């Protein structure tokens, strides 16, 4: 007997949401920004953020990271909610950094110092850190002091950045923990900056990574295309997180800047226990490692980091042997 019943009608399927991309790398275990951002918590702390919250293609709350004002307000909320920084702002067109990645650099530096301290992370005001190119945002000193209680000296060649960083420091009552100073000679990095009696346990640096303004602008175009924001009819801001020219490019690009930093560090071998710098491209490592060999560094470390889909790294080097590197 033939079954003449019609098969049950299938319900039309709703279009599936795109699958969220799988993370290729994770943040440092001590990083405060694991997983998705708690926007309810952030908005409770900083109500102004509510106006900038959107739903991304995966149905998750986010912000438009191509909007400089949104990124600035978002950073302000993160700093207030997670680090107790109640007052933070930067001038227009200055670098507005992604905080989780900046925090990772500091956590891995803390691990590096722990290796010379019987595995214990050194904390407190006895630990001195030098932030080369601290910028108007003063982000590394703010995070490093909040997480580890370290004392910071920040340097910059830009008087506007120095003024903005000073305002942030004073507004948050951190003048005893963080100070900033201007490098008056734009051709020097460390030379002429430090007093001969000063000693630091670690230095850190986020170097300019382009060799020219044109190269920086091409990099901006690539980033905006990736964000789906490129519009050939209008002038784009230089990179989606802002940035003044001296923050983004210098003669010789990243390799040129880091090579100069290495050469100058060799003239001050005992004033900083561990020198370090971010390196934006893995392909830049061989010439940097060659420069370190020529400079006579006793030990060199390349530390890989990762934030979601982004891979990053920093190079650390020292001219001191193990016995000379005790943190206290």
From Swiss-Prot:
Keywords: Cytoplasm, Methyltransferase, rRNA processing, S-adenosyl-L-methionine, Transferase. Pfam families: Methyltransf_10. InterPro entries: METTL16/RlmF, rRNA_lsu_MeTfrase_F, SAM-dependent_MTases_sf. Specifically methylates the adenine in position 1618 of 23S rRNA. It catalyses: adenosine(1618) in 23S rRNA + S-adenosyl-L-methionine = N(6)-methyladenosine(1618) in 23S rRNA + S-adenosyl-L-homocysteine + H(+). The keyword DNA-binding does not apply. It comes from Pseudomonas savastanoi pv. phaseolicola (strain 1448A / Race 6). The lineage of its organism: Bacteria, Pseudomonadati, Pseudomonadota, Gammaproteobacteria, Pseudomonadales. NCBIfam families: PRK11727.1. Gene3D superfamilies: Vaccinia Virus protein VP39. The keyword Protease does not apply. One of its GO terms (biological process) is rRNA base methylation. Its EC number is 2.1.1.181. It comes from the Bacteria. The gene is rlmF. This is Ribosomal RNA large subunit methyltransferase F.
């Amino acid at each position: 007997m033939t079954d003449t019943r019609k098969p049950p009608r299938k319900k039309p399927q709703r279009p599936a949401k795109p699958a969220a991309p799988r993370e290729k790398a994770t943040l440092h275990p001590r990083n405060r920004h694991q997983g998705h951002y708690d926007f309810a918590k952030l908005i409770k702390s900083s109500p102004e953020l509510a106006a900038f919250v959107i739903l991304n293609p995966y149905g998750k709350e986010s912000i438009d990271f191509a909007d400089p004002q949104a990124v600035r307000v978002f950073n302000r909320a993160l700093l207030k909610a997670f680090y107790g920084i109640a007052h933070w702002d930067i001038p227009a067109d200055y670098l507005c950094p992604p905080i989780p990645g900046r925090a990772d650099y500091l956590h891995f530096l803390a691990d590096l110092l722990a290796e010379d301290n019987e595995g214990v992370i050194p904390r407190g005001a006895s630990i001195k850190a030098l932030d080369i190119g601290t910028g108007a945002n003063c982000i590394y000193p703010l995070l490093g002091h909040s997480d580890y209680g370290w004392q910071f000296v920040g340097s910059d060649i830009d008087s506007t950045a120095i003024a903005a960083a000073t305002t942030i420091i004073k507004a948050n009552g951190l003048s005893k923990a963080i100070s900033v100073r201007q490098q008056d000679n734009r051709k020097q990095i460390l030379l002429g900056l430090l007093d001969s009696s000063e000693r630091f346990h670690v230095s850190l640096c986020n170097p300019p990574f382009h060799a020219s303004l044109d190269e920086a602008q091409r990099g901006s175009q690539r980033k905006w295309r990736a964000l789906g924001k490129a519009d050939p009819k209008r002038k784009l801001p230089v990179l989606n997180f802002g940035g003044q020219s001296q923050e983004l490019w210098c003669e010789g690009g990243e390799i040129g800047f880091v090579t100069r930093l290495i050469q100058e560090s060799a003239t001050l071998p005992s004033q900083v226990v561990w020198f370090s710098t971010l390196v934006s491209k893995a392909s830049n490592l061989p010439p940097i490692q060659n420069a370190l060999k020529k400079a006579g560094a006793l030990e060199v470390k390349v530390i890989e980091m990762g934030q979601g889909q982004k891979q990053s790294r920093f190079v650390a080097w020292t001219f001191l042997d193990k016995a000379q590197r005790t943190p206290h």
